[in-house]
Amino acid sequence: MAAAQVISNSGHDDMIHDAGLDYYGRRLATCSSDKTIKIFEIEGDTHKLVETLKGHEGPVWCVEWAHPKFGTILASSSYDGKVLIWREQHQSSTAPIGSGAWTKVFDFSLHTASVNMISWAPHETGCLLACASSDGHVSVLEFRDNSWTHQIFHAHGMGVNSISWAPAASPGSLVSSNPGIGQQRRFVTGGSDNLLKIWDYNPETKTYNATQTLEGHSDWVRDVAWSPSILSKSYIASASQDKTVRVWTADASNPGQWTSQVLEFDNVLWRVSWSPSGNILAVSGGDNKVSLWKENLRGQWEKVKDIEE
């Protein structure tokens, strides 16, 4: 198991809100209330600050690396209502990784309030970034034919806190008798209206439409995470201000029928995150602990480990 690396000298002048490793685990991006993003090179047990990105006018909540097939691209979102896309430009194709200069290649500023979370779609569906804002809207940015386009639409009346894409392949498609169905564009949002909504892309109208609403939480939905598993079931985890996590499950044979299991905690919950294989769920909240959960053979979710510093 990989050991945790502590970056004590982050260089930030204020609270750090998010951190993310790139696809290869060689670089770490962090963002802070000091309005900056910092990029570190990670090698073994050492790290080196290589770049500070400035462009936001408020606290930066979220940083997300794109898949490397699209280049070295980082997206950031902020309290200032902006989503910025940064790209590392190399002088030549043989230049080593980390040697390029970072530039801001797109500035999306149509949201009228804080952009709380951003999420890249599975790379099989294209270079797509979904953004969740306190103005109640979701935007989807797409990079295609060397230019950026966008859609923006209303999602939750009291604000959108979180967003997560479904896997590109639908559950059961790997063992389906009709495997050529294609890649789905689908995501889930969590809002301050206590609801989750599932959105599907309609290629004919080229719009995203809310196809399902999941009710159960009694307070704000702080985070949502769609499991990357594409076996026989779909799983969505949601973390709420109501001190519960719900694990929503839909079987491949009846994909529109979602049931949920409630996991109760003693504190407000902030984040949920799935392991790469989609079988272990990590939960973190106001007690500064992380707990790991797994589904047993009876279909019940049980805690397998507590992690605390």
From Swiss-Prot:
User: What's the superkingdom here?
Assistant: Eukaryota
Q: Which UniProt keywords apply?
A: Cytoplasmic vesicle, Endoplasmic reticulum, ER-Golgi transport, Membrane, mRNA transport, Nuclear pore complex, Nucleus, Protein transport, Repeat, Translocation, Transport, WD repeat
- GO terms, biological process: COPII-coated vesicle budding; ERAD pathway; mRNA transport; nuclear pore localization; positive regulation of DNA-templated transcription; positive regulation of ER to Golgi vesicle-mediated transport; positive regulation of protein exit from endoplasmic reticulum; positive regulation of TOR signaling
Q: What InterPro entries has UniProt attached to this entry?
A: G-protein_beta_WD-40_rep, Sec13/Seh1_fam, WD40/YVTN_repeat-like_dom_sf, WD40_repeat_dom_sf, WD40_rpt
Q: Which Gene3D superfamilies match?
A: YVTN repeat-like/Quinoprotein amine dehydrogenase
Q: What is its main location?
A: membrane
Summary of the function given for this chain in its UniProt record: Component of the coat protein complex II (COPII) which promotes the formation of transport vesicles from the endoplasmic reticulum (ER). The coat has two main functions, the physical deformation of the endoplasmic reticulum membrane into vesicles and the selection of cargo molecules. It also functions as a component of the nuclear pore complex (NPC). NPC components, collectively referred to as nucleoporins (NUPs), can play the role of both NPC structural components and of docking or interaction partners for transiently associated nuclear transport factors.
Q: What is this protein called?
A: Protein transport protein sec13
Species in which this protein is naturally found: Emericella nidulans (strain FGSC A4 / ATCC 38163 / CBS 112.46 / NRRL 194 / M139) (Aspergillus nidulans)
Gene name for this UniProt entry: sec13
